[in-house]
Regions:
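Short glycine/serine/proline-enriched coil/turn segments at secondary-structure junctions
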Residues: 18, 67, 114-117
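Residue-level structural signal for beta-strand termini and adjacent loop
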Residues: 40-41, 64, 113
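A glycine-rich, hydrophobic loop/mini-helix early in the fold
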Residues: 46-70, 74
Length: 164
């Protein structure tokens, strides 16, 4: 499909370069010939996994998220290192955060969580045929995995208890 609308980057200035993100201030040429300033957060992306047990439960994690200043329910996920294969990252997150490995992985696609100003892409897989192993959390990572029935997880999303 050909793009009907476009913006062309004319200039890009790095305002901040961190461990996780880089922030640029860009000048873009709009389709009407005018220019606009765009602030863009550049991110290496993330991998997310949906661990589904045969009994109809999911492994989810509760983790404090500093930016939101609250503990959130989440699916196991993590950021990609530069050049890291998303599938390998998803398998790593399953083991690190839930202490699980899987016999089968099904790709669920990818999505852009914040398209207005962020380049992040999150790649997702479902994991089945789960086996218990050891959790391997990073030194600065504190979370609690828990099994949540799928219908309960749906209710938690609809009630706003799961927001991530």
């Amino acid at each position: 499909m050909d793009a009907a609308h476009f913006e062309k980057t004319l200039t890009s200035e790095v305002l901040f370069e961190g461990r996780v993100v880089t922030l640029t201030k860009d000048t873009a040429l709009l389709e009407n010939g005018k220019t606009a300033t765009r602030e863009v957060v550049h991110h290496h992306g993330g991998a997310c996994i949906v661990p589904y047990f045969e009994d109809g439960t999911l492994c989810m994690v509760r983790q404090f998220r500093y930016a939101m200043q609250q503990e959130l329910w989440e699916l196991p996920a993590g950021k990609l290192e530069k050049g890291e294969d998303p599938f390998e990252a998803a398998k790593r997150e399953l083991e690190e955060e839930c202490g699980l490995t899987a016999d089968h992985y099904t790709p669920l696609g990818e999505f852009y969580p914040t398209v207005g100003y962020d380049t992040e892409v999150i790649y997702m897989w479902a994991a089945t045929g789960l086996h218990k192993t050891q959790m391997h959390l990073d030194a600065d990572e504190f979370l609690t995995p828990d099994r949540v029935p799928l219908d309960k997880a749906y209710e938690m999303v609809m009630s706003g208890e799961i927001r991530d």
